[in-house]
C-alpha cells in the first residue's frame, strides 16, 4: 500500500507541472491593469505558440481613466490601442524554472511600432501572473500635442495569465 501511494504521488506531481510556455500549439490569455503617464486602464493579450520559442498574438489596451488636456476629455479612439505582436519565449533557453517565461518581443499597432519585455510565472497548469513593459520605437504621429502620447509611451502592465 505504501509503494502504491508513493507511485500515485509521483504520477500526480509529474503530470501536473505548471509549465509557462510549451511551444507550438500553446495558447496564453492575459488580462490586467495598464499604467502610463496620464492614464490607467485595462490590458489583455492573446498569444499563440508557433514554435519551440516563438509566439504570435494580439494585445488590446483601453484607458479607463485618462487625464483631460486643456479641459477636453479624451475620446474612445484616444483611449484605445490594438497591436499585433511577436514574442521570443526564452525562458527555457536561459534555463529558467519551467514555471517562468521571459519573452522580449515586437509589436505593430494603430499608434506605433514598438518593443516589449514580459515575464509570466504559473502557479498551476492554468493560472499565473504576468508583468510587461513596452516602449514605442517608431511613432506614426510624432506631434506631442493632444492625446498622441496615450498608448504611445512607456507602458507598464501587470495581471493574471491563463493557459487555454
PLM regions: where:
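Predominantly the C-terminal beta-signal and adjacent terminal strand-loop region
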Residues: 63-70, 120-164
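Transmembrane beta-strands of outer-membrane beta-barrel proteins
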Residues: 26-34, 57-61, 103-107, 132-134, ...
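Short glycine/proline- and aromatic-enriched beta-strand/turn motifs that initiate or cap beta-hairpins
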Residues: 18-56, 86, 91, 161-163
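Solvent-exposed loop/turn segments connecting transmembrane beta-strands
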Residues: 30-43, 76, 105-116, 143-153
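Gram-negative (and chloroplast) outer-membrane scaffold detector with strong preference
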Residues: 47-125, 162
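Outer-envelope beta-barrel architecture signal
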Residues: 3-5, 21-29, 40, 52-56, ...
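Cleavable N-terminal export/targeting peptides
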Residues: 1-24, 164
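Primarily recognizes Gram-negative and organellar outer-membrane beta-barrels
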Residues: 20-34, 66-70, 99, 143, ...
Amino acid at each position: 500500500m505504501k509503494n502504491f501511494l508513493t507511485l500515485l504521488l509521483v504520477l500526480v506531481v509529474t503530470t501536473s507541472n505548471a509549465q509557462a510556455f510549451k511551444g507550438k500549439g500553446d495558447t496564453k490569455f492575459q488580462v490586467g491593469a495598464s499604467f502610463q503617464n496620464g492614464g490607467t486602464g485595462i490590458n489583455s493579450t492573446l498569444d499563440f505558440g508557433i514554435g519551440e520559442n516563438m509566439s504570435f498574438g494580439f494585445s488590446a489596451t483601453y484607458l479607463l481613466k485618462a487625464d483631460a488636456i486643456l479641459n477636453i476629455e479624451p475620446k474612445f479612439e484616444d483611449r484605445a490601442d490594438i497591436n499585433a505582436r511577436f514574442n521570443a519565449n526564452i525562458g527555457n533557453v536561459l534555463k529558467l524554472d519551467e514555471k517562468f517565461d521571459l519573452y522580449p518581443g515586437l509589436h505593430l499597432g494603430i499608434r506605433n511600432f514598438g518593443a516589449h519585455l514580459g515575464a509570466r510565472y504559473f502557479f498551476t497548469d492554468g493560472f499565473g501572473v504576468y508583468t510587461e513593459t513596452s516602449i514605442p520605437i517608431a511613432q506614426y504621429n510624432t506631434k506631442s500635442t493632444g492625446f498622441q502620447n496615450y498608448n504611445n509611451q512607456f507602458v507598464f502592465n501587470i495581471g493574471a495569465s491563463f493557459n487555454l
